[in-house]
Structure formats: structure tokens, C-alpha cells
Amino acid sequence: MSKKLKEQAANDASEGDAIKVFVRVRPSESHDADAAFGQCLEVRLPDTIIMHSKPEPKVFTYDHVTAANTTQESVFTAVGKRIIESCVGGFNGTIFAYGQTGSGKTFTMLGPCEDGDNFHHEMRGVIPRSFEYLFSLVNREREKHGDRYEFLCRCSFLEIYNEQIYDLLDPASLGLHLRENMKKGVFVDGLIERAVASASEAYGVLQAGWHNRRVAATSMNRESSRSHAVFTVSIESKEKKAGVSNIRVSQLHLVDLAGSERQKDTKAIGVRLKEAGSINKSLSILGNVIMALVDIAHGKQRHVPYRDSKLSFLLRDSLGGNAKTYIIANVHPDAKCFGETLSTLKFARRAKMIKNRAVVNEDTQGNVMHLQAEIRRLREALCMKGAEGSIPRGPSESGDSQMSNSSTESNGPVSGQQSGSSSSSKWKKYFLEAMSLRDIVEVEKREMREKVSSLEELCSKRDQVISSNKMIIKFRNSTIDMLQKTKNKALLKEDRDLLNENLKKEIEQLQEQLEHNPFVMRYVVENQSLRAQNKKLKMMEAVRSGEAMAATKAEELETLFLELREGLSKNRRYSSTPVDGEKVPTSTLVILKSQIKKLQDELENAKQEHAEQEEMTRTTRLDLESELAAYKKANLDMEKTLQGMKIKNRMDRDAMNDIHMQTIKSITTPKKVTYQLRSRTVLRTAGEETPGGPGFAGLSDNGSPLRSHSTNSLPPSGDILVTNSSPAMSEEGIIDEEMPEHVIEQCNEALTIELQKLQDKNANLQQQLEEHESQKHKMLQNSSKLDHQLQQITELYSTESQAWQEHEKDLTTRLAEATIQISTLQRDYEMTRGEAEDFKVMLQAADKEIGQEKKQKSKVTQDWDRVRAALDAQVVRLENEMCGQSRELENLTEDREQLQDAYNTLQAEHEFQQQREADLENRLKGKKAEITQLQEEIQKHLEKLDSERDKSMRLTAELRQGDNTKKDLLDAQELIDQFREERDDLLHRLDTEALKLSSSKEDLETVNSALTAIKKTDVEQKEALSSLMAALQGQKGMVKDKEEQLASMQMQLEDTRGQVSLLEAALEEGKASGAGLQSQIAALEDRMHAQAGEYQEQIEQMRADAMDANQHQKELLKELEKQSEELTQLHKQMKEKEEEYETKESEHKDTIESLEEQLEEVKTNLSTVVVELDEPESKKRKMADAQAMEIESLRDSEKRFKELSSVYDNMRDQMNEEIRSLKMKADELEDVRISKEILQAQHTALTYEIEQVRNEMAEKESSLKDEVNHLKRDMERQKTVLASMLRDKDEAVEKLYTVQTTLDQVKANEEILQENMDQVMEELDRTSALESTHFKEKEDIKSKLEEEREEKSKLTKDLTRLKEVYEEAEKKITELGGHQNPKQKIHHLQAVKSENYFLKEEVESLEKQLGKAQSDSEQMKRDYEALQKRLTSSSAEPPEEAGATTCIRCLPHSKRIMQTQTA
């Protein structure tokens, strides 16, 4: 894809994807009968349109507004070019025209309809020009990219007629259906698509479909579109680059909408009226969609009714979706179309507020290797951009550079005396490079070995974990089998001990698993590798910037999280209502208690984990401190050994110097061994040329050896160059004698062999010494580490032992106190056991009651469930009705808004018509006043004419009576002539006034007809307004009825909800009561079980610790039994007393009753039996006194019983408190015991580790000895290998030298190619820039040429019109040729001649302008052809400077053309 299109797409994306609106005002035609009404629009370029209305004019602002005289090319330049460039760049695009019928939509989109071939017409529309521009862009891309750019274009053409979709390319097709897919989106099923490769083929497809479109004539438009036409162009481009294919797919929708119509304007009846209804319905749905999208853009929640119409559903992506959309709003400027124009402008203003989300529809395909290479390339480009072009060189590049530098240095000119030094420097550089490569390989090998060792350790730990898991499974299976055996029985002591042992072993296995966890080792390895990667990544600036951005983003998110949490806490605080403690149900309390218990367990686990973590950190800290101390000690030892080595090296060097001086003296002093010692002049290294060659610089011209001075020390790497002649030799004349060659060779060989042996022996000894030193250093380091650990362990052991002793003392004191309290606990146990039995009986009774209550509750719940189901069904029905009512209410509100909008437009139109009516009435009054004035002037002129006639008649009579004199006749003749001229003038003026009067009468008639039409329209509008008001009132009444129905439904719903809430409350109360009883029973059971379990555990724990207090316990038990027996006796006595009291009370009641009966009987005989009555009253008093005494005694016994029960309760509470305290103490003792066991286990583990370390030290010593012996043997083997390696090294160096020379040549060639490539790229950039400028200039010239053609066609039309006017004028002249009045005829001919002359001048000026325009167009054609030739030549060959100058020379001509156009 070209750079221009990418930049254009980027610019479009940056500007935003809002729907853009272009408003075009059509010209007012002369044949309109109401053209005299004037215009209601005023255009202010470039983006404002003003609509004249009362009380204030309405101002609308859009993206672009054009006047009536605009050209088709300017419309396409503003609308079509950017959309088509975006489509070629991969975006979807849509252009559609909107407006009332007859506003010029089809003309804008297609062109003039009267011409059959309107695709090549000068006035062709947006669609044909879009084809031309699209394929010009495609051809441009093909010329630029060649075969790498593939293009496929498919066209389809459909129409929507009466909400049915028809394929215009298939006339026999029936109604098609819209489908929706995840990949394609919305598409038409079964629609024909034809592939096109040029603009002419696309023209053919459009023309073939256009003939099948439904078009009909109305009173407002000769060829009115009766359907919505959608022409779709699917563009698919494929660009191949480095094996990767970038595929871009886009769609271009070109839509010609049918116009909105009014039946009173179009006079449509029958089928046309039905078509107009469907058109208006689809357009109103489109308006509803745009209103919903505008509401969504303003933040409201709205449903967008895309599916209400086929048109809106098909254009869903174009309206608020993935597309760039341009709307051309066509409006009529005349006053008669005021309402439709206002609604169109409002629609366009609403559409301008919609935002689309356009994205590039691009996909990448290719081979996996190519895609990975592309990803690598992009990452490298990102790294280069982040590092600002500075890429670090790798070791291979540095090595290559060093080798190239060395080669360049070796290739330079060197003198004969420095050949030995250059060869030695070359060998040294090669050696250093080899050593650096060896170091790199060693580092990699070390890393791989560490990785392998870590993986082996990981495998071993994983094996240990597997074995420990197997052991754990085995222990758990055994415990499961044991528990299954003793499922229905109590556990024996042996089984319990076995279970505890298994659990302890399982815990040990788990601890071992924790110590040898493979995941920890794996995480360690991964951590190391990730740290290394992290270091590498942190060096990159892109990663640093990404981290900074991530940190800032994390801070922002954290602040946002804190703000949200504060808001939630505030909401909870505000929303939470205080609830009384009495109203909280028991189920919530149980849930809260369980949550508290869970939280306590989690807290205990966290504390335990915290303690374990502290223990682990303490052990790791001890290990690290010991390692640190060992490293410090090892560093000190190393420094000491280093100082010793330096002193030793200095001494060795002094000794070697002494030996060297002695050897020189021994060589030079004796006289007998002169010949043997002369051979010690030179010792050379292996592999170099001998100095005795033909090129040796130490020989003179005559071949005699030159003398050289003796060296004071041996040169490095075993090279000895000594040329020495002592004074004694010179005295004896040995110098004059020549040395035999075989003697020199034998001496040299003997000395080299001896020196090589000494060097080998020295190297072996040095290596052994270094190995022993390293082993000794490691051993010392380990021993120091172990000593430090041992010291730390002993210190820790001493502190722990002291703490343990203190703790043991505390435990003994606590144990003594616990034994004292056990006796009291035993007593409490017996008491609670009795209470437990009582509770069991109570629980059984409570279970029976609960069962009965459960039955009752199940019946009640079933009844409530039935009632609740019925109420739920009623609620659902009411909610459905409410949803339907709310939907109807929304629809009614939408209809109300639409009616209100229509009412507003009608109101504005009515006000505009009233204003126009007032203007016309004023104009009519003015015309009437003018007519009256003209009539008065005519009357005056007629009267004057009559007086003049009378005068002429009198003069003629006087002339007939007598000829007085010739002079009087002449005067009279002159007067007659003057009168005649005045009469002609008056007649001429009368004719003109008559013409004016006729014209004013015609104007008056037109005004009257306009007034009548306005009155009719006013009446019709008033009727429509009244009907609308009636409909609005009806709608309001319906809305009120619906609201009342909704209110009643809501009341019913509230009542049913209240009933449901009451029923639910009653149900909840029943559930709560049942749950309360169940919770009470469960609490009692839990408390009983818990107390029984606690007491059982306490007794089992304290039996073992309190065996010596059994006797005391037995005594207490006896006393307790006695007290219980006394209590039972007291209970029995109480029961007996109560029974006696009840019997006596009954007897007393019987006696009272009998006495009352006797009293009734005795009342009659009262006077007679007074003496007999005293005896029973005394008996009764005695009996009452006795009963009172018994009652008082019973009350005293009851009081004593209550006191005893209170004492019993107090004792029981004290015993419970003592049991709790003893339990806490026992727990503390258990914790102390566990900590003691842990310390003992740690102590044993540390002693075991120390023994293991000692054993390992001994094993390592023995293994080190074996390794030393093995290394000695290896050294002997490696000596032989070294010799072969040296030979291989020489061969490799020679090969390396040859490769280096070839590499230098390749690098030089590469630099030349890179320079050529840079030049080619610069030329390519220049050509692309020139091509883009040429393309812009070509398109500008093309658009200007099209505008000139359009102006030319307009001028030809004006010329033909003027010719027609001229011909009509000639006809009128010929008609006036037979005029009777000669003077009037002469005046008329003179006026016609002047008019003819004026028209001829105008025609000549127009012909001149036409010729000039033709010459300019021909010149522009020539320039255009020249530009095309230059473009083809520039695309075929790289541009030269001459081409650039010619292109620059073309610019003044285009400026000249522009100047002529402006002129």
C-alpha cells in the first residue's frame, strides 16, 4: 500500500469517524409557476446555511455547504475522494443522498437522466466519478508495486421497494432476505456479485441495473425514484512482502434514497400513493435510528431500532458502526418547499452528531517461518528505536573486527628488520582470540553443567517426594483400615497408640518432603534464569519506558481502587440499618459463630505458619552468617598466600637470573670447550623460521656473522637470543675461525631438548601446586564454616537449655497445682454425668415435640408454597403486563416526540406562509397604487390629446377657409409637425403605459392566484394542524388512559407484593421459630456432647497424672454420694409433703363445702342449735391451725431446698472454672513438651549433620588423592594430544588467514553494494515524492478540466437559449413589419435594432469566451498528456534533474490556467 494512502488513512483516523454532512442547494428552475415567491435559503460559504423564518432566522452549520451554481466535480472532490482513498486503505465507506423528492439526489449521485449515456457526460454524478478515481488509485498502486500487489473488485446492485429487496442485476429475482453473520456482518442472501477490472466494466454493471430500477412520474418530478437503490463495491487488495501477505477487505456503499413526498404536492393516487407511504415509513424509521444514536451519544440508554426497516438494518455499520460515512443532503431553495427543507436540515444536523468506529479490515497470511521472521524484524526495529540506533555488537562481530584489524595490520608494509616482531604479534593476536573463544565456551559449559546439576538435584528430590508420598499413602490406608474395623466400637489403647505412631511417621515424611521439595529447586533454577533475562531486558530502554508506564498505570489503578473501596465502605455505612439484638434470628447467629470459628482456625494456622517461617529464616540466617565468616577467613588466607607467592616469585626470578649469568659465564670463559659453547648463540621457539635462513638480518654482505651484545635476562616464552663473543676468544683468535655447521646444529638441538624438559617439568609442578592450593583453600573454607556453625549451635544450645530448665521448673509448679485441682474436677464430673442423663431424657422428649412440629411445619410450608406459587404467577403476569405497558408508553412517547417535531415544522411553515402572505398583500397594495397612478396619467394624456386634436381641427379649418400668407402656412405646418410629434410621443407613452398596465394586471392576477393558493394551503395546513392537534389530544388521552391503567396495575402489583411480603414474613416467622427450636436443640446437643467430650478428655488426661490422689477422690465421691442421697431423700420428702398437702387441701375443700351445706341447712334452725354450733367451729379452728403449721413447715423445707440448689449451682460454676483453668494449663504443658521434643530433634539432627560432614571430609580427602593420581595420568596423555593440537592449530591458522582475506574482500564488496543500495533508496524516495506530487497535480488538473467542461456545457446551453431568444425577436420584427403607423414602426424598428445589436455583442462575447475556454481545455489536455508521459517515463526510469526541471516548468502554466478561470 502506498505511503500516501497510509498517511491519508492515519489523518482520517486522527480526525475522528463522525458522520460528515454535505449540503447541496439545487437551482430554482424558470418554469416553476411559483418562482415569484422567492427563496427561503441563504448560503454562506463554506459551511453555513441560513433559513429565513420568523421571529428569528435559523442558522445551520455543516461540514460543507454549496450554492446552486456548484459543479459536479467540486461535489465529488469534497465528498468522494477521501472516502474512496479510505476504502482502498482498508476502511468501509458509505455515501448516500437524502432529501425530498425533486431535490436533485439522483442527479447528484448519477447525473442527468435525460441523457442515455450519462456515464461519460460532463455532468455525470458521484458514482461514475467514484469508479474512475477508484481504478486510477488501483492502477497507481499496481504501477508502484508491480506483481506484489493484487486487486479484486466485485459489484452488486439492489433496490428496496415496498420493504422488499430485489436484485437489479437479476430481473427475475424475487424478494431476497437479509442475513447476519459474525464474519460478514449484515448481508443479502443470494445477491449476485460481478467481478470488474476497470471503470468501464463497473459502468456496465451500473447501467444494467439502472434500467431495471422502478421510476415513475409525479407532479413534482418527471422521473421520481420509487425505491432505495444501493450499489455496493467490495474491494479486496493483497500485498506480498517477504513471504507475508497483507490482505485488506473493504466495502463501498453508494446509496440513492427515494425522496420524502406529500400527497398534496405530488398528486399521487393508487399505486404511487402506496409507494410514497412505504418510502416515508422507511425514511421515518431511518430518522428514529439517527435520533436513538444521538441519544446514545449524549449518554442515554436507548434501543436502536435497526430491524424495523430493511434499509436501516442494511446500513447498520454505516450508522454508528465500522464505516466512514458521508451524507449529501439535497434541499430545494423555494419557499413552497419550506417544511421539507427544514426537516431535511434537521435530519442532517442530527446525523452529524453520530460517531462511527471505523477500523482497518486487515489480515496477515503467510508461512509460519515468514511470520516468525516478520515478528523478529519488528522486534529488532522496536529495540533499535528504543536504543536510538545504538545496537551493541556481539562477540562474534568483535572477534571479526579484531581479526579484520589484525589482517589489515598484517597486510600493511613492514620493513625487513621488523618482520620477526610482526609475525610474533600476529601469533599473539591469534592466540588471544583463541583463548577468548575458549573462555566463552568454558563459561557456556559451566552454565550448562550447573543447569544439569540443578536438574539432577531436582529429579532426585522429586524421587524422594514420590517415595514419601507412597509412605504417606501407606500410613493413611492403614489408619483407614483400622478405623473401618473399629467403626462401631471404641478404640483400644493399643490401636490408639498405633494410630498416633502412624500419624507421627506421616508428619516426619511430610517434613522430609518439605525439606526436599522439588518445586523449590525448580523455582530456584527458574528464578536464576529469570534474573538473567531480567538483567538483559532492563538494559533495553523500551523495556524501561514500558516499566515506567506500567508503574504509573499501577499507581493510577491503586488510587482508583482506594477511591472505590472508600466509596463502597461509605455506601455500606449509609445503607446499613441498626438491628436490635433481640430481632436477630438464631440462624444468622449460628452462621456468624461458624465464621468466627473458621477465622480463629485460620488465625491459628497463620500463627503456626509464621512460627515455621521464623524458624526457617533463623536457620537460613545462621547458614548465611557461617558462610560469610568462612568467606572472610578464606579471603584473609588468600591474601596471605598471595603475598607469599609474590615473595616466592621474586626469589625465583632472582635465582633464575643468577643461574642465567652463571651459564653465560660458563659458556664464555673456558677455552677447551669453545666449539661446544659457540652453538648457544640462539634458541628459537617451535614453529618459527630459523634465523640462519637466506633472509636473516644478522649476516653482513660478505657472509661473515655479526657480533651482538649479551642479554641480561631470559626473554619470555622461552626465546633466548644470545650472540656473545668474549674478550678471551678475541685474544686467542677464535673469532677469525669459522664454526662447523654440524657442531652448531648439535648444540642447538641439545639445548632445546634440555630446555623443553625443564619447562614441561616446571609446568607440571606448577599445576599440581595450584591444584593442591585450591583443594587446601576449599578444605579450609569448609572447616571454617563448620566451626562457625558449631559455635553458633553450641551457643544456641546453651541458651535453649537454660530456657528449658526455667520452663521445666515452671511446669513442675504448675503440675503440683494441677494435681490439687484434679480432685475437685472429679467431683464435678460425677455431678455433670447425672445432669447429662437428665438432659438425655429431656432431649428425647424434645425430639418427639420437634417431630410433631416438623410435621405441622411441613403442612404449613406446603400450603404457603401453593399460595406463594399462585402469587408468583400473578406477579409474573403483572410484570409482563407492566413491561408491555411500558413499551407502549415508550412508543407513544416516541410518536409524541415525532408529532411534536412535525407540529413544530408545520408551525414554522405556517409562520413562514403568513409572513409571505403579508409581504404579498403589501406588494399587491403597492401594485394597486401604481395602477391607479398610471390610469390617472393615461386619463390626463387622453384629455391633452383631445385638446390637441381640437386645435388641429381648428387649424385645418382655418387653412381651408383661406390662404393668408405663405409664412403663416409654414408656421402652421411646423406647428402641425410639432403637434404630430407630441401626439406620437404621447401615443408611444400611452402604449408603454398600456403595456405596463397589462403587465401589472398580469402580476395582479398572479398575486391573486398566489393568494388564493396560499389561502388554500393555509386552510389545508390549518386542517392538517387541527387533525394533528386532534390526533395529539387523542394520543394524550390514550397516554392518560394508559397511565391510569398502569397506575391501577401498579396498585394491584403493590397489593399483591404486600400480600406476598406478609405471607413471606409469616413463613419466615414460622421458619425462624422452627429454626430457633432446632438451633436450641442442636445447641443443647452440641453443648452436651461438647461437655461430655471435654470431661472425658480431661478425665483421661488427668487419670495418668493423678494416680496418688485416688483415695482422696474416693472419699470425696463417698461424700458426694451421701449428699446426693440426702438430696434424693429431700426430693422424696418434698414430694411426699406436696402429696400430703394436696390431700389435706382437698379434704379441707371438701369439709368447707360440707360446712357450707350445713350452714345453709342450719340457717333456718339457727335459734335452736346455737350451742351445738360452737363445737364444730372450735374443731375447724384446730384443723386450720394444724394445716397452717404444716404449710409453714413445707415452706421452710422448700426454702432449704432452694438454698441447697443455689449452693449446688455455685459449686458447679466453680468446678467449671477450675476445669477450664486446668485445661489451659494442660495445653501449655503440652506446648512445652512439643517444643522440647522439637529442640531435641534439632539437636540430634545437628549432631548427625556434624558427623556426616566429618565423614564427608574424610571421603573427600581420599577422593582428592585419587583425583591427583588420576590427573597425573591425564597430564601424560594430554601431552601427546597437545602436540597434535599444535599441528592442527598451525593448519587452522593458515586456513583462517585465507578466510580472513576472502572476508575482507566480501566486506569491501558489501560496503560498495550498501552504498549503491543507499543511492537507489534515495532515488526511490525522490521518485515516490515526485510521483505523489505528479499524482496530486494530475488530479487537480483533471478536476479543473472537468469543471471547465461543465462550464462549457453551461455556456453552450446559454448560447442556444440566446439564439432561441434572437430567433423569437426576429419573428417579432417580421410580424411588426406591416405596422400601419410609419413613425411608430420606425421607433419600434430602432428599438429592435438596438436590442439586436446588444444581443449580437453578447453572443460575440460568449463565443469569444467559449473559444477561449476551448483553447484552455485543449491546452490542459496537452498538459495532461505530457504529464502522463512524464509519469510513465518516471515510473519506468529513475528521475533525472531535467525531469524535475520540466515538472517545475509545468507549474506556471497551471497557474496561468487558474488565472484565466478566475478572470
From Swiss-Prot:
Q: Which parts of the sequence bind ATP?
A: G99, Q100, T101, G102, S103, G104, K105, T106
Spell out the residue ranges making up region: Disordered.
Answer: 387-424, 686-720, 1335-1356, 1409-1444
- Feature: compositional bias, Low complexity: 415-424
Report the superkingdom from the record: Eukaryota
What does the entry list under GO cellular component?
A: cytoplasm; kinesin complex; microtubule; spindle pole
Example of a GO biological process term: mitotic spindle assembly
The UniProt family comment states:
Belongs to the TRAFAC class myosin-kinesin ATPase superfamily. Kinesin family. KLP2 subfamily.
What is the recorded name of this protein? Kinesin-like protein KIF15
Question: What is the protein's known function?
Answer: Plus-end directed kinesin-like motor enzyme involved in mitotic spindle assembly. Plays a role in positioning spindle poles during mitosis, specifically at prometaphase.
| Entry keyword annotation includes ATP-binding | yes
Compositionally skewed regions (Polar residues) per UniProt = 398-414, 701-715
Q: Spell out the PANTHER family in the cross-references.
A: KINESIN-LIKE PROTEIN KIN-12D
List, as start-end ranges, the regions of compositional bias called Basic and acidic residues.
Answer: 1418-1428
* Listed GO MF terms: ATP binding; ATP hydrolysis activity; microtubule binding; microtubule motor activity; plus-end-directed microtubule motor activity
Q: Does the keyword ATP-binding apply?
A: yes
| Compartments where found | Cytoplasm; Cytoplasm, Cytoskeleton, Spindle
**What is the protein's quaternary organization?**
Homodimer.
Entry keyword set? ATP-binding, Coiled coil, Cytoplasm, Cytoskeleton, Microtubule, Motor protein, Nucleotide-binding
Locate the Kinesin motor domain: which residues?
18-354
Q: Which residues form a coiled coil?
A: 436-517, 586-646
